[in-house]
A protein has these predicted regions:
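Cys/His-rich microdomains that often coordinate metals
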Residues: 15-16, 30-33
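Beta-strand/loop-alpha-helix module characteristic of Rossmann-like adenine-cofactor folds
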Residues: 2-3, 9
Length: 130
């Protein structure tokens, strides 16, 4: 098992070779890794047509992040496991950000370690914010 791989925020499987924001496409659910959509999981229309939250619902029902990709995704291969902490977004539990109109977020990303945007991990950067 490759513990050094990074998880897809849509399906949770460790398939990415680089930390969040490198636009890798998940071979399991076909989600394109997008830093803005990880930070703002209710926001559609960046690299993916649907929001991360909607993509997670789609994956649960259709096996792919977007309905238009039905038939193009695949199941996890042997050795591809989910991140041990991963779970779908829970609005009652997760303190996720909503983008504000007119705010430039380009300089406010945690560029050194973007894994702090994983809302499901104890290291989530907004874990203590309320």
């Amino acid at each position: 098992m490759d513990y050094w791989k990074y998880p897809c925020p849509c399906c949770g499987y460790r398939v990415f070779r680089q930390q969040p924001g490198n636009h890798e496409k998940c071979p399991i659910c076909l989600w394109e890794d997008d830093l803005a959509q990880l930070r703002f999981p209710h926001m559609p229309g960046s690299s993916n047509r649907v929001s991360l939250e909607q993509a997670q619902h789609n994956y649960a029902f259709f096996g792919t992040a977007e309905r238009r990709n039905i038939g193009g995704a695949r199941g996890p291969l042997e050795g591809e496991a989910r991140d041990e902490f991963w779970r779908p977004i829970d609005p009652s539990r997760d303190n996720v950000e909503e983008p504000q109109h007119g705010v430039n977020y380009a300089d406010s990303y945690p560029l050194a370690d973007t894994t702090v945007l994983y809302y499901w991990r104890p290291t989530y950067w907004r874990r203590l914010a309320s």
